[in-house]
């Protein structure tokens, strides 16, 4: 698979019709896991374009495992097992680099994930609750999707962020669920000041509309709770109280 993704090039301007292309370029760098170089004139980049760099920084040092290496001329399914990365969750990247739609069906048990599971997608913020053990994804041509995979233990948990493609593994720490106080808390840190969101799964038995946040602002109150936070190089604490 790719051992050197070369320089990341996404241009300096926002080009909506090329959004999926830019996403794929950024994901290719992430699945490599190694050093990245900037292929654009950074000083002239729109913030939206520069973000394709920042979501890869810092690099993780972990390359994904291509699950279909011997099935296709160019692999499309990449897995980061948490047992190898040391992350608290698995990551799965799908890259449809063809001119035809693709339907994917992945048995999570083949990835070492058993029982009820959750799959949170980085770009679209879609959440899939998986009861039958299969993640089913339909991708249009030339499209990439990137999932954080979690076991559903029936308690609130961090399912992702929009700060980094590891979705919490490099930027979130000290996460704790206190069942007596009904609070979920943690800290977030980034190389520099940065605004973004932490996404929390709120299972049945908890009312997300009654949630109260400290150190963050609640931007949506569905089963996936979006917390807007201001991160910095110093760890920033956050907490969500789920009132009875």
Language-model-detected regions and their locations in the chain:
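Accessory, solvent-exposed terminal regions and/or long lumenal/extracellular loops of proteins
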Residues: 153-209
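C-terminal beta-strand-rich structural cap/linker in extracellular carbohydrate-active enzymes
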Residues: 131-169, 223-244
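Short amphipathic beta-strand and strand-loop transition segments with alternating hydrophobic
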Residues: 79-83, 174-177, 217-218
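Solvent-exposed beta-strand/loop surfaces of large extracellular or lumenal domains
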Residues: 116-134, 210-229
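Active-site-proximal substrate-binding groove within the catalytic cores of carbohydrate-active enzymes
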Residues: 1-127, 132-153
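Non-cytosolic beta-sheet module surface loops
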Residues: 96-98, 108-110, 139, 188-192, ...
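Short beta-strand/loop motifs in extracellular/secreted proteins, especially
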Residues: 102-104, 115-117, 194-198, 206-209, ...
